[in-house]
């Protein structure tokens, strides 16, 4: 498993004590959450302690999301969660710092987001409902579809101009990553199929999920963002430390570096 081998090597060679924070980036439906869970399990088999977080955990509260949308009425991408600008970046920074520095035997509460709240518009759960993570840890996997994206010099899509500007705030996350793993789609349209499949599996399991048409419509909103920001990520990882790029075929399996 190249991802586990890469992550364990980065952990073994990390220059400072404390947990390795691995940034895991990849398009929607590519298997980030599954891989993150596999890495946590793999470290467990090695007798090491690990947990995984998602950028989704630190989405804005619903009232903050509404305020953002009202602030930029001409930018429909801010009507709902997802794009750069819809996360509490400072909350994410504090969370990563806490997991890295808390005293042994203590616990850190991790934000939790309820995507079903407000008829599917979503809201952050109250602090008392946040799960606790026991520390110290050896590995923190921090995953997200737009993790590692950096501002484009000249965004060609005016609808993404403000989101591009918001990306500058996310540098504080990159500064806390000790290694970076990029799952890249070999073809852009794979992303659409992956999301449709994911929603289909969710429905088949008995959970609420988008129809095929709804899932395709939803994910196509993000394709311009991938086109704008992914090329730079391919050329230049967001950190100076160890990084690995895995190109995925339509079956989500690596086809090459």
Predicted segments, located by residue:
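Conserved nucleotide-sensing/catalytic segment adjacent to the nucleotide-binding pocket
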Residues: 51-52, 58-122
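Hydrophobic positions on the alpha1 helix immediately C-terminal to the Walker A/P-loop
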Residues: 35, 39
């Amino acid at each position: 498993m190249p991802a586990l081998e890469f992550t364990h090597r980065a952990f073994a060679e990390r220059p400072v004590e404390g947990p390795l924070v691995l940034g895991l980036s990849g398009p929607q439906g590519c298997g980030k959450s599954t891989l993150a869970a596999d890495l946590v399990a793999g470290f467990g088999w090695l007798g090491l302690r690990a947990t995984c977080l998602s950028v989704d955990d630190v989405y804005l509260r619903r009232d903050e999301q509404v305020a953002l949308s009202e602030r930029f009425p001409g930018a429909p991408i801010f009507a709902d969660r997802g794009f750069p600008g819809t996360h509490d970046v400072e909350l994410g920074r504090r969370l990563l710092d806490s997991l890295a520095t808390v005293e042994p035997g203590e616990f850190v509460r991790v934000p939790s987001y309820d995507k079903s709240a407000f008829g599917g518009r979503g809201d952050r759960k109250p602090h008392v409902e946040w799960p606790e993570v026991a520390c110290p840890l050896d590995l923190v996997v921090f995953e997200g579809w737009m993790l590692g994206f950096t501002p484009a010099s000249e965004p060609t899509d005016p609808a993404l101009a403000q989101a591009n500007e918001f990306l500058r705030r996310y540098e504080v996350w990159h500064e806390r990553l000790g290694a970076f793993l990029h799952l890249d789609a070999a073809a852009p349209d794979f992303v659409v199929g992956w999301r449709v499949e994911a929603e289909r599996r969710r429905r088949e399991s008995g959970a609420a999920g988008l129809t095929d048409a709804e899932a395709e419509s939803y994910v196509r909103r993000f394709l311009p963002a991938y086109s704008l920001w992914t090329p730079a990520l391919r050329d230049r990882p967001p950190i100076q430390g160890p990084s690995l790029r895995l190109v995925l075929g339509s079956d989500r399996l690596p086809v090459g570096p």
